[in-house]
Amino acid sequence: GKWTRDEIDRQINFIRNHKMAGEGHYRVKYLMENTQGIYDELIENFYAYPALQPPMPWLDNVPPTAPSELKVRTIDSGYTELKWQAATDNDPRNNPMYIIYASNEYPVDTSRPENIVAQNIRETSYIYAPILPWNAKKHFAVTAVDRYGNESTAAQK
């Protein structure tokens, strides 16, 4: 391509600094072929953490209720089981999904994407199995999210 990685970096930083609603990349061929190392650059520096669907307030701006009664217990092999009471949504057609956050700091900061360990969970339980057991997190938060991207406050433990 007739572009530089610095140009892509500047464009992404501009979009983020001005809180614009998303970004697109043309052509995907450059990403797939890692032209000029652009794929590696994006994964390492811009998209290193999971992203949540942005809210769509023009369709619905009311988040679900927060999950409640979060219980956390250690089970076999150092895994951690989380259980909670279901959230409800103002739209009866919508069953909220859940986002699981984990951190060594309490309360868990749900504004930090690096704390997301799972999303789109449909059940009211989750087994946390850290990739590196010695790097397991101690504190957990669970939020509910509706189909419009509205996220509830967190149940914390």
What are these regions (language model features)?
Residues 10-14, 69-71, 128-129:
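Generic recognition of flexible, low-complexity loop/linker segments
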Residues 29, 70-73, 106:
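Short, solvent-exposed coil/turn elements at secondary-structure transition points
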Residues 1-58:
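Substrate-binding cleft of secreted/luminal carbohydrate-active enzymes
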Residues 93-135, 147-155:
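Recognizes extended acidic, P/S/T-rich segments that occur
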Residues 37-93, 134, 147-157:
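Pro/Thr/Ser/Gly-rich low-complexity, intrinsically disordered linker/stalk tracts
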Residues 28, 86, 130:
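Active-site donor-binding loop signature of nucleotide-sugar glycosyltransferases
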